[in-house]
Structure formats: structure tokens, C-alpha cells
Regions:
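A short acidic/small-residue loop/turn micro-motif
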Residues: 13, 46, 108-110
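C-terminal active-site "lid" helix and adjoining low-complexity regulatory extension at the edge
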Residues: 51-70, 80-85, 94-133
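Phosphate-binding site of ATP-dependent enzymes
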Residues: 1-44
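Phenylalanine-focused residue identity feature
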Residues: 10, 22-25, 63, 87, ...
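Extracytoplasmic/periplasmic proteins that interact with beta-lactams or build/remodel peptidoglycan
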Residues: 36-58
Length: 133
């Protein structure tokens, strides 16, 4: 019923490049949807694990995403603009002033990034929601 947030991923640059693009060696880690806390080590596309960010030396697991409830509410509201699209991967940034900024919505979001950090396939979960009537 309504919009369902299926997964959330924390993405960041690797310390050498400023991009968070996973396929250009950005890092990705799973966020607990309920709490907004990062629950897995980050990985890169070579599946190297990072418990500590290589440049900032900040701990990754346990990091609390700022303004998490606002992020969830923002993407749910945005998803209602086109309710006939059953699957959207939202790229969202939290600005320094706390403002939530939607960068883009992807109707062909990359499934790698939601599955590699915890090594759990997501298709059964997604299929159920995408095809429910």
C-alpha cells in the first residue's frame, strides 16, 4: 500500500576520486531503512571492503545518515508524481545546510549496488512489489 522504500545505499567517493559512482571505484554500503544507520562495510566494484573511509578515516558501519526521515519522506513524495512507474532508484544528497536534494530518479537503477555490500540477492523481494496489482 503506497510507496515502499525497498533498499537504501550510502555512496561516497573513495578518497582518490570525488565521484561516488560505484563503477568508477566509488564506495557503497547498505543503510538500514528504519534507522538511517549504515549497517555494512562499504565496498568498491572489486568487492574490497572498507570499515574505515580511506581518506577521512571515519568509521563507516554505524554512521547515521543526517535527516534520514526527511530523505524517506522526500523520495516517497517524489515517487507519487509518477505512480505508474513501479521502480525508481533515487539519488539523493544532504546538503551542508541540511536541505534534501534529489539529484535524479532512475527507472533502471543498478541492482549491483543494493546487492554487493551484503551479498544478498534482492530479486525475490523486488519481484513481489514490482508485479503486485
Amino acid at each position: 500500500e503506497g510507496v515502499k522504500v525497498m533498499d537504501a545505499v550510502f555512496r561516497c567517493g573513495n578518497g582518490e576520486k570525488c565521484t561516488d559512482n560505484f563503477h568508477h571505484f566509488g564506495l557503497a554500503a547498505i543503510i538500514d531503512i528504519q534507522t538511517g544507520i549504515v549497517v555494512t562495510p562499504a565496498i568498491d566494484k572489486l568487492n574490497q571492503k572498507y570499515y574505515i573511509h580511506p581518506r577521512t578515516k571515519e568509521q563507516i558501519v554505524g554512521f547515521k545518515i543526517p535527516s534520514w526521515t526527511k530523505i524517506i519522506n522526500t523520495v516517497k513524495k517524489a515517487a507519487l508524481v509518477k505512480p505508474n512507474i513501479r521502480f525508481i532508484g533515487w539519488d539523493v544528497a544532504v546538503q551542508e545546510n541540511g536541505r534534501i536534494c534529489i539529484i535524479e530518479g532512475n527507472c533502471t537503477a543498478d541492482p549491483d549496488i543494493t546487492q554487493m555490500p551484503d551479498q544478498i540477492g534482492k530479486w525475490p523481494k523486488y519481484r513481489e512489489v514490482i508485479f503486485e496489482r
